[in-house]
């Protein structure tokens, strides 16, 4: 692949030969030299549940700790319920602004209002850090993971910032690391660009496992460290890139500890799937992001309001149909492209019955139908036989 075929983000990283930066882990102690040991959490009632001890574990080693980078709505959802895991691990929330350290001190912790149960889950039992190249001028000086490797990393920033965050911390990533991207976007590490990026940024034999998590839960922000779980749904997690371990050649990405830990986290209904299936699920989520979400933002309405009119001459219906045709064409082009051969082959092998051979061309044809405009429209709740007028 020539440099002209590289996307801009990859070209910029390929020409970057600088070593990965050393990062300092600031804590609230670096903002306020002396903090009160106890923080008044107020009085609780029947609609509030406090989980201050849920994250307390004997070990604080980095190989046991979960690091949630970008604790926004999705990060807060998973942090809340990871803390309620039967085998809960210590959790560090990595914020993107220094000011959030002070806000953490002043707030009651991570709050998640569950609309279904009518409960407000509050948890102050997390460690909160801000990672920066700037050494703190006062307070304890601590490098990220004490200069060791991070094992369990959950990146829930906005999609466009996900890989940049992972690249910034690559000094602390290696073969022992499992990195999960949980965002409303397609992971950049799929072939053909992912393997090229990884071979450029990591030494051979010391590559992390990278996975993607597609989240369908409806979660809205209600303030710093506070979210509303408005629409419970489900989620899927699967591997994007993993390197075979010469010491354990029989190991499969489904054996990854962190993937299994997320899949067994209560109340978020996260299903573990194959690499090919998570690729397809990300593409399906892309349909919502490309055709529906921009319209709800532009028209300042809820998703359901887009489907109140089914008339063939309705201007909004025509716009949505046009967007779906364009989105379908792009995704079908990707499915049919030679660079997608490896992931489609992996998906075909996973879907084939034991003892039978898989037909990649047949699987590719079915996937082309899966992402056709009529099927996409049906999945969005529209009538397939409606005249589009296009």
From Swiss-Prot:
Cystine connections: none
Annotated active site: 285
Alphabetized UniProt keyword annotations: NADP, Oxidoreductase
Entry annotated with the keyword Transmembrane: no
Gene3D superfamilies, per the entry: N-(1-d-carboxylethyl)-l-norvaline Dehydrogenase, domain 2, NAD(P)-binding Rossmann-like Domain
pH dependence: Optimum pH is 7.5.
GO molecular function, one term: 2-dehydropantoate 2-reductase activity
Thermal dependence, as annotated: Optimum temperature is 35 degrees Celsius.
Record EC number: 1.2.7.-
UniProt activity-regulation remark: The reductase activity is increased by Mg(2+) (195%), Ca(2+) (169%) and slightly increased by K(+) (123%). The reduction activity is inhibited by Fe(2+) and Co(2+), and almost totally inhibited by Cu(2+), Mn(2+), Zn(2+) and Fe(3+) (from 3% to 9% residual activity respectively). The chelating agent EDTA had little effect, suggesting Mg(2+) and Ca(2+) are not determining factors, though they could promote the reductase enzyme activity.
Reactions accelerated catalytically: (R)-2-hydroxy-3-methylbutanoate + NADP(+) = 3-methyl-2-oxobutanoate + NADPH + H(+)
One Pfam entry name: ApbA
Binding residue positions for substrate: 289, 293
Entry binding sites for NADP(+): 70-75
Top EC class of this enzyme: oxidoreductase
InterPro entries with a match to the protein in the record: 6-PGluconate_DH-like_C_sf, 6PGD_dom2, Ketopantoate_reductase, KPA_reductase, KPR_N
A GO term from the CC aspect: mitochondrion
UniProt function note: Ketoisovalerate reductase; part of the gene cluster that mediates the biosynthesis of beauvericin (BEA), a non-ribosomal cyclic hexadepsipeptide that shows antibiotic, antifungal, insecticidal, and cancer cell antiproliferative and antihaptotactic activity. Ketoisovalerate reductase BEA2 catalyzes the NADPH-specific reduction of ketoisovaleric acid to hydroxyisovalerate, a precursor for beauvericin biosynthesis.
Family, as annotated: Belongs to the ketopantoate reductase family.
Protein name listed in UniProt: Ketoisovalerate reductase BEA2
Species assigned in the record: Gibberella intermedia
């Amino acid at each position: 692949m020539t440099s002209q075929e590289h996307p801009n983000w990859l070209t910029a990283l390929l020409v970057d030969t600088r070593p990965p930066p050393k990062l300092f882990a600031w804590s609230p102690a670096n903002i306020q030299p002396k903090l009160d040991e106890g923080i008044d959490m107020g009085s609780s009632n029947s609609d509030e549940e406090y989980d201050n001890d849920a994250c307390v574990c004997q070990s604080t080693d980095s190989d046991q700790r979960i690091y949630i980078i970008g604790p926004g709505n999705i990060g807060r959802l998973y942090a809340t319920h990871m803390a309620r895991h039967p085998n809960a691990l210590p959790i560090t929330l990595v914020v993107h602004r220094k000011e959030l350290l002070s806000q953490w001190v002043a707030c009651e912790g991570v709050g998640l209002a569950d609309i279904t149960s009518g409960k407000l889950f509050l948890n102050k039992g997390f460690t909160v850090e801000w990672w920066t190249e700037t050494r703190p001028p006062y307070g304890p000086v601590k490098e990220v993971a004490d200069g060791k490797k991070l094992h369990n990393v959950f990146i829930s920033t906005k999609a466009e910032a996900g890989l940049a965050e992972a690249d910034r911390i690559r000094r602390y990533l290696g073969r022992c690391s499992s990195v999960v991207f949980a965002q409303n976007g397609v992971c950049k590490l799929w072939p053909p660009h992912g393997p090229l990026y990884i071979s450029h940024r990591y030494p051979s034999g010391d590559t992390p496992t990278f996975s993607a998590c597609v989240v369908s839960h409806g979660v809205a922000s209600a303030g710093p460290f506070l979210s509303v779980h408005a629409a419970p749904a489900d989620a899927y997690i699967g591997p994007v890139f993993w390197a075979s371990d010469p010491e354990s050649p029989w190991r499969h990405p489904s054996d990854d500890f962190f993937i299994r830990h997320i899949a067994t986290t209560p109340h978020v209904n996260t299903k573990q799937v194959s690499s090919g299936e998570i690729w397809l699920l990300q593409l399906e989520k892309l349909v919502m992001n490309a055709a529906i979400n921009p319209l709800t933002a532009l028209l300042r309405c809820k998703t359901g309001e887009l489907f109140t009119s089914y008339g063939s001459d309705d201007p909004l219906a025509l716009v949505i149909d046009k967007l779906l045709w364009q989105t379908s064409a792009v995704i079908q082009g990707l499915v049919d492209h030679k660079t997608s051969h490896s992931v489609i082959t992996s998906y075909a092998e996973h879907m084939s019955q034991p003892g039978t051979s898989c037909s990649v061309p047949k699987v590719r044809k079915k996937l082309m139908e899966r992402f056709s405009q009529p099927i996409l429209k049906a999945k969005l709740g529209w009538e397939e036989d409606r005249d589009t007028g296009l």
